[in-house]
Amino acid sequence: MKVIEGGFPAPNAKIAIVISRFNSFINESLLSGAIDTLKRHGQISDDNITVVRCPGAVELPLVAQRVAKTGDYDAIVSLGCVIRGGTPHFDYVCSEMNKGLAQVSLEFSIPVAFGVLTVDTIDQAIERAGTKAGNKGAEAALSALEMINVLSEIDS
């Protein structure tokens, strides 16, 4: 039986991180976690990491699509934070963003790791940005690294 698994080191990989500015006090912690993980676990140098900022979570799929279209990157890590408010806006933003990022991944055959917090409260966001519940930016970076290696193994 053949089992294909990917590790984390990918020293020659080029990674784009697309990150929304809205809720930046949370997003910057996610970004720090992602970059640290790419460097430590992926052994990726600063020269192979590009950070692209956009206004909000709804814009992430378009930015990810443009990045993927260049063909310059091996994976994209999407980061952001959407906090539920008192209107249905949260549901629309989260749904469309998630669908859009998945579509980019399939359309361009590139890993698009999901590191966007979709939470009910600011406390939940803080917990997931590097305190009690780990750092979801770091977890998304690990997912991107593993997917680069899994796809490489499948293609070889």
From Swiss-Prot:
Keywords: Riboflavin biosynthesis, Transferase. Its EC number is 2.5.1.78. Gene3D superfamilies: Lumazine/riboflavin synthase. SUPFAM superfamilies: Lumazine synthase. It catalyses: (2S)-2-hydroxy-3-oxobutyl phosphate + 5-amino-6-(D-ribitylamino)uracil = 6,7-dimethyl-8-(1-D-ribityl)lumazine + phosphate + 2 H2O + H(+). One of its GO terms (cellular component) is cytoplasm. CDD domains: Lumazine_synthase-I. InterPro entries: LS, LS/RS, LS/RS_sf. Pathway: Cofactor biosynthesis; riboflavin biosynthesis; riboflavin from 2-hydroxy-3-oxobutyl phosphate and 5-amino-6-(D-ribitylamino)uracil: step 1/2. 5-amino-6-(D-ribitylamino)uracil binds at residues 22, 57-59, 81-83, 114. GO terms for molecular function: 6,7-dimethyl-8-ribityllumazine synthase activity. One of its GO terms (biological process) is riboflavin biosynthetic process. The active site is at 89 (proton donor). It comes from the Bacteria. (2S)-2-hydroxy-3-oxobutyl phosphate binds at residues 86-87, 128. Belongs to the DMRL synthase family. Forms an icosahedral capsid composed of 60 subunits, arranged as a dodecamer of pentamers. Catalyzes the formation of 6,7-dimethyl-8-ribityllumazine by condensation of 5-amino-6-(D-ribitylamino)uracil with 3,4-dihydroxy-2-butanone 4-phosphate. This is the penultimate step in the biosynthesis of riboflavin. This is 6,7-dimethyl-8-ribityllumazine synthase. It comes from Vibrio cholerae serotype O1 (strain ATCC 39315 / El Tor Inaba N16961). The gene is ribH.
